[in-house]
Amino acid sequence: MSEKNAYAKSGVDVEAGYEVVERIKKHVARTERAGVMGALGGFGGMFDLSKTGVREPVLVSGTDGVGTKLMLAIKYDKHDTIGQDCVAMCVNDIIAAGAEPLYFLDYVATGKNNPVKFEEVVSGVAEGCVQAGAALIGGETAEMPGMYGEDDYDLAGFAVGVAEKSQLIDGSKVKEGDILLGLASSGIHSNGYSLVRRVFADYTGKELLPELEGKQLKDVLLEPTRIYVRAALPLIKEELVNGIGHITGGGFIENVPRMFADDLAAEIDEDKVPVLPIFKALEKYGDIKHEEMFEIFNMGVGLMLAVSPENVNRVKELLDEPVYEIGRIIKKADDSVVIK
């Protein structure tokens, strides 16, 4: 018995792995940017930091996955956008620290390598990288029979960005009286899907719920996470924002306080939050308490900015989209987030 046949009999298809690499090359090429060194397939991805032109560079890194949203991608056999979700979860975190994404690496683990499916996954990763301005400089596809079912896979990503030391955003500049501006989310994004799947467990995904304005349920549930790099980066370069919050797992209650010091709080005007139809549907069909919705989901705001009052008009001018003035920073009395 040859070694190759022995490995194949154990459930690992080496040839399928090679095919994945060949299929994804054209997608990786789309993400090329200044600073990338070497070619795809090396032992390590390389990047020349001097090409960024940053005088006092601070590297900022982030890693994340997309949770059980993957289970819906598998259920509905739609894999071409889940990669964008993975990129978004990572780059939105580092943009919140004031960093411009430079490069990205992905990791896919599966029970059986399916070259067509994983080309779709990586095409989504590449699309996310293009939107973020990050190069896809490396990755890994691990075939692990026995660990995962044949149709199952997991996806994680790793982003590295750079910031001028003087432009880092760490919450220290946020002050009482700052205005809280919200940028719209594209949907649920990539958090809370264990609850989402429970609520819609008996649905096929083809339903046209009245709350969803003519869209099929599965399309709304798999809407890719918005990437905020292009919107936020010009504001960071002009030093117009004092704090940035990426509203992910834990919703408003967990993420907004990460924007500022412990002696401050956020006062949110609920009437000004652009709640998306899917959240109204989740609250209704899941019988979820209204206040709990803000503890789980982004509720229609995926990125929150703390801005000095005198800079609000300039921020709105630079952002070519609706901007929601949803609250302000106050002195903390009890709770870190007060929703009125």
Curated annotation (Swiss-Prot):
Superkingdom as given in the UniProt entry: Bacteria
Organism annotation: Streptococcus pyogenes serotype M12 (strain MGAS2096)
GO biological process, one term: adenine biosynthetic process
Name the record gives this protein: Phosphoribosylformylglycinamidine cyclo-ligase
Reactions catalysed according to its record: 2-formamido-N(1)-(5-O-phospho-beta-D-ribosyl)acetamidine + ATP = 5-amino-1-(5-phospho-beta-D-ribosyl)imidazole + ADP + phosphate + H(+)
GO molecular function: ATP binding; phosphoribosylamine-glycine ligase activity; phosphoribosylformylglycinamidine cyclo-ligase activity
UniProt entry keywords in alphabetical sequence: ATP-binding, Cytoplasm, Ligase, Nucleotide-binding, Purine biosynthesis
Record localization: Cytoplasm
Entry keyword Cytoplasm: yes
EC assignment: 6.3.3.1
Family: Belongs to the AIR synthase family.
GO terms under cellular component: cytosol
Gene (UniProt): purM
InterPro entries for the chain: PurM-like_C_dom, PurM-like_C_sf, PurM-like_N, PurM-like_N_sf, PurM_cligase
UniProt pathway: Purine metabolism; IMP biosynthesis via de novo pathway; 5-amino-1-(5-phospho-D-ribosyl)imidazole from N(2)-formyl-N(1)-(5-phospho-D-ribosyl)glycinamide: step 2/2
Enzyme class name: ligase
Coarse class of the protein's main subcellular location: cytoplasm
